[in-house]
Amino acid sequence: MDIEHVLNTHGIGATGLRTFDKKPPLAVLGFDATASGGSVVLSWTNPDDSDFAGVRIQRKIGSYPVDYGDGITVYKGKNSMFVDDSIDMNARYYYRAFTYDFNGNYNKSDTMRSVARIENLEKVYGVDIDQSNPDPFTAVTYVGEAVGLTPGSAIIDAIYPFNRIRPVLLNSEGEAVSELNKNNFNLTAQGGTANLNSRHNVMIEFPKLWIKMETVGDVIQIRFASSKIDETYKCLAHMKGNEEKDVFYLGAYLSSYNSGMLKSWSGYRPATALTIAEHRNMARLNGEGYGLVSFYQWLYIQILFIFKYKSINSQAALGLGYTNTSDRNANVSGTTNAKGMYYGSQTDNKERVKFLGLEDAYGNYATFLDGILLSPTYEMLTATMDFNAFGTGYELSPTNIASSLNGFISKTHGTTTQGFLPKEVKGSSAGCYGDRAMLFSNNPFTCGGAFTESSSVGMFYLNSLYGAS
């Protein structure tokens, strides 16, 4: 039951007093419904009206809702965009928006209508990366459904899986109990104040994606889709052993040490000087399913970075990250809370980066990467569960690495299972990836890179030099 509606239709306003206001607020402008990747992206501009309290969006199949009580309510609030993903394929959905005020008056203007057709036609997006091309931007080419996209544009955020990625508060049972405002994590999606450093962890939710990655000559071919196209497409980031998960979560911040466990909280210094085993164990204390970033989850993020910016040099595409070597004090988390889902500066090395809501995706401090090891003979060992220091139970795959590597990445293996594991390095950061790799056998991995490594850090930085396990 809509209690607010019941009260207001009986003449009781927001203050609990009888009101004689019968005039609804102005209509929204530019109401649009666009089908994208098995969902519908609804967008509009809210009216500049002091009487405006929110917008209610109704959905029907076959015809437009005749009133705000007709059909299914898919959204109610003050945002200007909503992704409707509770839909079926092969249907035409009719949407109608109704603005309302604090006294229950609804605007029923016919201008606030739109329709979207959802077809069972799987779209495959992708990029090709020519590793022989030293230019990190022109080395990347959009292919498939991605042809014609503008790198870095908001249009990309309407494509699956970008349109389903969201910041949330996650409880100890692994349940998202509140969605945060993508533009400002200090607020909930409904506009209330969010508690970012108390009971729940601040996490980013990532939906399942099917990925195919192979190398032909010097060209890495990456394709992804919202469903399994054929047996060559894998959803390894969403696998836990043999079980597929619909989503996975990563901490929005570098982990901090609180109450005897690792937390993803705003306003705290990152936990440092701990081994990967200590990090792993303290993360698990949060509840069932908690752990560290895994290799295949990070590969998922790397692929989306390339797709978003059409570049394999993250510092050139997004920002330097916190790489100011004159200040050795780790910055507290949350300084990018009000900076949306993406942020970076290409001139100021004291500014943090943020990608898909992940603060310090690189820079500030490196992040342990679980589920990957190199054997004494440099075979690659990977797993999607039961992570440990010895690679017990991990899958082994041969690599093109014969001994340790230390330098700037020029070529990677470029397969679905080996991802961007480097296979060739050079002495200069100029061209291609621009990130450093330090690969040694039997040691735990870190990714991203720390502030002390300056221009070496980035989305493809990889380090297994240090032996603390």
What is the role of each PLM region?
Residues 1-23:
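Enriched but not universal
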Residues 17-53, 89, 103-119:
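Pro/Thr/Ser/Gly-rich low-complexity, intrinsically disordered linker/stalk tracts
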Residues 45-70:
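Solvent-exposed loop/turn segments flanking beta-strands in beta-repeat/beta-sandwich domains
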Residues 78-83:
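Short S/T/G- and acidic-enriched coil/turn segments that sit immediately N-terminal to beta-strands
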Residues 84-106:
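Beta-strand-rich modules
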Residues 119-231:
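N-terminal module-boundary/linker segments of secreted carbohydrate-active enzymes
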Residues 123-125, 297-299, 320-338, 345-348, ...:
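C-terminal, surface-exposed recognition/capping segments
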Residues 193, 197-200, 227-361, 365:
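Short aromatic-cysteine micro-motif
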